[in-house]
Amino acid sequence: MNNEINNELNEIEVNDAETSDIFEEEVNLARSESREQAFMLLFSKSFDDEPLEETIDDNSEMFVGGVCAYAQAVVSGIEDKHEEIDEIIASHLKKGWTLSRISKPSLAILRLAIYEMKYLDNVPQSVSINEAVELAKKYTIDESKFV
């Protein structure tokens, strides 16, 4: 599944310059911490339909110094490209599987990794994949193999 997704994403040349600029400006947080914030926001957002700004405000107390700009930009980008990202995931599921069968943490991790690989030209795909696996090991039970 990973090879198929990688091949599909390699064929697409899309650059989200605004998110890339914010990513470069993130000096206070390690990239993995920024991704973890983005994951936590995505996971939290999966439980309600409130606007993204409210999700960020509601969760900003969890993070020392608030939510970083990179996490906000990535989650906003994922929200904008939600249908396209979910189509990519769904197209690689086994027969009979739907997105609703995937746990919320695993789905948030997959969305984050696919967004980075498809829309951010300054993040190597190998880094996105590795970070996704690390998040899955930390936040899922026996589902890290799925990611």
Predicted regions and their residues:
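N-terminal interaction/assembly modules
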Residues: 1-146
